[in-house]
């Protein structure tokens, strides 16, 4: 709550429309969030006090963590997650989490519509416009697309202004086109690499902050030798 109060002072406002717990992705994050004194209590206090209107959580690593967060029962207003045509074939938030949110009336916020990288677009597997339109055609409340240039902004605006949802057949055709290179996660490295972990979450789990450190490399090597996933 202290962090929320600091944000309100800096923003010079008395409330936030949406307050989300950032970067849920480690296997025991749900249990830590729901324990006594955990972040769920802070979300409850924030809503009850009127300091926030809506609360949710984000994450890009593991759909099972998202699903567990929801199944434990707190009435989240929003859940933010990566949704794109490559996700459908690898650790899929679309397949695992999206139906659960729809069932519970929780607003899905789709992020990383282009997979977080431009590799697939550069290789000609799909176009940027196709990927954005695919993500917007899913049953989401909003699609969040990163913009790093005026050209990208104009491209996104064109897709939005001319938007018509893809048919089920069109969406399946794009999934099928992406599947041969999607199944190993090469275009969704945020699900695999420590480089994309939230630093605060890494510290909470006592991981070194530098993903290139010797300690991390040793842990990854040990994981490869035992066949156990890391993290």
Language model region names:
Residues 1-92, 96, 102-109:
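Glycine/proline-rich, positively charged
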Residues 72, 96-231:
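Structured C-terminal cap/extension of enzyme domains
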């Amino acid at each position: 709550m202290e962090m929320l109060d600091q944000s309100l002072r800096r923003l010079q406002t008395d409330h936030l429309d949406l307050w989300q717990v950032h970067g849920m992705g480690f296997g025991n994050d749900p249990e830590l969030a729901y324990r006594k004194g955990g972040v769920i209590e802070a979300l409850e206090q924030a809503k009850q006090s009127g300091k926030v209107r809506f609360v949710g959580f984000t994450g890009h690593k593991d759909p099972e963590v998202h699903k567990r967060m929801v199944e434990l029962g707190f009435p989240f207003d929003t859940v933010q997650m990566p949704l794109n045509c490559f996700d459908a074939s690898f650790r899929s938030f679309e397949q695992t989490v999206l139906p659960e949110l729809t069932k519970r009336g929780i607003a899905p916020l789709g992020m990383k519509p282009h997979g977080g990288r431009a590799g697939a677009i550069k290789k000609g597997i799909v176009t940027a416009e196709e990927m954005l339109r695919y993500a917007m055609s899913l049953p989401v409340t909003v699609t969040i697309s990163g913009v790093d240039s005026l050209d990208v902004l104009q491209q996104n605006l064109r897709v939005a202004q001319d938007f018509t949802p893809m048919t089920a057949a069109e969406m399946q055709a794009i999934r099928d086109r992406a599947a041969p290179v999607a199944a190993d996660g090469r275009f969704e490295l945020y699900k695999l690499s420590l480089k994309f972990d939230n630093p605060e979450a890494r510290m909470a789990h006592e991981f070194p902050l530098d993903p290139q450190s010797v300690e991390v490399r040793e842990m990854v090597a040990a994981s490869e030798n035992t066949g156990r996933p890391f993290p």
